[in-house]
Amino acid sequence: MLNRGTVSCGVIHMGRLFYIVVALASLQSGCSSSDSDSALSSVPEYGLSENPYTSLQQVWVPNEPSAEVRAMMDDGTFTVYQHPQYAKNGLGTRLEEGVPWIEHRELAPDFLVQGTQRSSLAYILVLADPQIIDEESPIRMDGYANVYRPGGQLTPHVFEATIRTARRISDTSSRPFDFAIIVGDLTDTSQKNELDWMITALNGGVIDPDSGIDDDPIPGPGNDYNDPFLAIGIESPWYAALGNHDVLHVGGFGAIDSTLRDAARGDRLFTGSNFSKVWGGYVAGDTADHEVVFDASVITPADPDRLPLSETELLQTLYDAGGAPAGHGFSLDDIAAQKAYYSVYPVAGKPIKMIVLDSTDAAVTSLGSMGKMQFSWLHEELLGAADKRELVIVVSHHRLEDFHDKSEVSAQRVRDLLVTSDNVILHLTGHGHRDTKMLQTVNGEEGFWELMTTSTIDFPMQSRVLELVDEHNGYLSIYVTNVGHNSAATTLASKARQLAAGKLAFGTTFFDGDTVAFWAEEVKAQNLLLRVALPEDVSRNLENFSDWPDTVESIDTLSHF
């Protein structure tokens, strides 16, 4: 583990390797550019495939267990914890041909042809549920098979590979992404170090995914899950919503209270969960096969950076994260008021408004909710956008159908408000760890699309690229393209994808039907082309703004990889 808080031009001896520790901040501390370049080059970084690809070109598909292997699963002789046996038993992935965009005209029944002069209004990266894991934390719940992920220790690597892949797409395009939005569940255990790793993946720098003491289960740099590695960052403005994993113990096992905060910084397995059938468990960081420890008498080296963050601390950390934009949507007034919802104009100077909601309920459940104060605020934001004839994108961690029945404001009331605001075109969500599309409409012709994006923590480990295209004939086309991380075959992120596909075969997740057999249906909600009839006043207002890009990146870049 790198010495925390030390950024200099000196050499730190870590026992296994000499590192010159100079991340991006070193340029601000008086280090020369050559010193910085030398420092960063001394930290391994993980490469991508030779050629970029999206799910238009090829998709990773999980292997279905054979009848013999399924019998072993059923009788308990092959369990989800025996991940070293996954490949031997045929679990993993294979590549298949990509899937085209599936066109939907439900919100544009009279749409005939694309415009002859098209404008790209927004080029967006959507990320969901990275759930970065500190696998050595004593408050992990890996004794519960639904919580356990055989590649959990590789979540920093997967998220960085996802960002690295997106960065290559952005750099290959004629313009960078206008912005990125993470739709919640930034961390898995709500810990400070997990959030720090996620932020570094987005901003660039050195990620040291080790905690406790300096572990090096496989001697040498860049070859095991605890080795530091270099993140290149997205180089686009990014925003974030909160999810249940950011405000509850492992997403739903109790509040973040003083007992949990003390236990997280301790050295013994936490056994204080109120859930009688849920068992603690964490990964021993000195084991090459990342073995899970279930014995509460075994010591895991303590680490103060494992502190589970309060909502105020979480918002302050995001505000102070650096990178663009300043505050990432949050203000100091928001933080003081514990207000985790906001609105922004993510495409500078253009009439596109993004409203980011806080659908979490830190006191009750992992499901979604909304209070009366936020609902009133949302109503005012929508009225303001209508008055200014703006396009509106709504973001929340939970879909409307994932709200719980004790929410102060019901999902139906939120839906009714959004669906009667005719300039709302999209509701972007996460939480369910799969791709879904839901048409929210009043009469079958007016409404918006609710899109849930799959997680980067679980198979298929994808993000989404969205592009809003004005056809200049009264219609908007929304291109939705899924992108799996393009990790080179020998990288740890590539290994994580194999492990995630293996877990999928066991069906041990929180989501009904989340098995290999479900995959055939999952693909149908991946690449989409959504046609939307624009309100006349919004369409006219868009024409008042000049210098929209005329290159449609989805056509000219993504489809040509």
Task: For every predicted segment, state its role.
Residues M1-M14:
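N-terminal secretory signal peptides that target proteins for export/translocation
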Residues Q28-G30:
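C-terminal motif of bacterial Sec signal peptides marking the signal peptidase cleavage site
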Residues S32-S34:
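Bacterial signal peptide processing site
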Residues D37-R118, A122-S137, M141-D171, D178-F179, ...:
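Metal-dependent phosphoesterase/phosphodiesterase active-site architecture
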Residues V126-A128, D178-D185, I234, Y239-N244, ...:
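Active-site neighborhood of phospho(di)ester-bond hydrolases with catalytic His/Asp-centered motifs
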Residues G152, D361-S376, E380-T429:
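Active-site-proximal segments of metal-dependent phosphoesterases and phosphodiesterases across multiple
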Residues D188-S190, H245-G251, A363-V364, R399-H404, ...:
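Active-site environment of divalent metal-dependent phosphoester hydrolases
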